[in-house]
């Protein structure tokens, strides 16, 4: 999981979700696209 100041979708399968006040990107097609803001 990458931790970045700015998270954005990398591919069409990426989804932006909020968990516990943080913004996450989850991706079913490519697990390397997982990101968290912070």
UniProtKB/Swiss-Prot annotation:
Q: Which Pfam families match?
A: Ribosomal_L36
Q: Name one GO cellular component term.
A: cytoplasm
The UniProt GO MF terms for this protein read: structural constituent of ribosome
Kindly state which keywords UniProt assigns to this record, in alphabetical order: Ribonucleoprotein, Ribosomal protein
Q: Which InterPro entries match?
A: Ribosomal_bL36, Ribosomal_bL36_sp
One biological process term in Gene Ontology: translation
Family annotation (SUPFAM superfamilies) = Ribosomal protein L36 (SSF57840)
Q: Which domain of life is it from?
A: Bacteria
User: According to its UniProt record, which protein family does this protein belong to?
Assistant: Belongs to the bacterial ribosomal protein bL36 family.
Question: NCBIfam families given for it?
Answer: rpmJ_bact (TIGR01022)
PANTHER family listed in its UniProt record: 50S RIBOSOMAL PROTEIN L36, CHLOROPLASTIC, LARGE RIBOSOMAL SUBUNIT PROTEIN BL36C
Q: What is this protein called?
A: Large ribosomal subunit protein bL36
Species for this entry: Psychrobacter arcticus (strain DSM 17307 / VKM B-2377 / 273-4)
Name of encoding gene: rpmJ
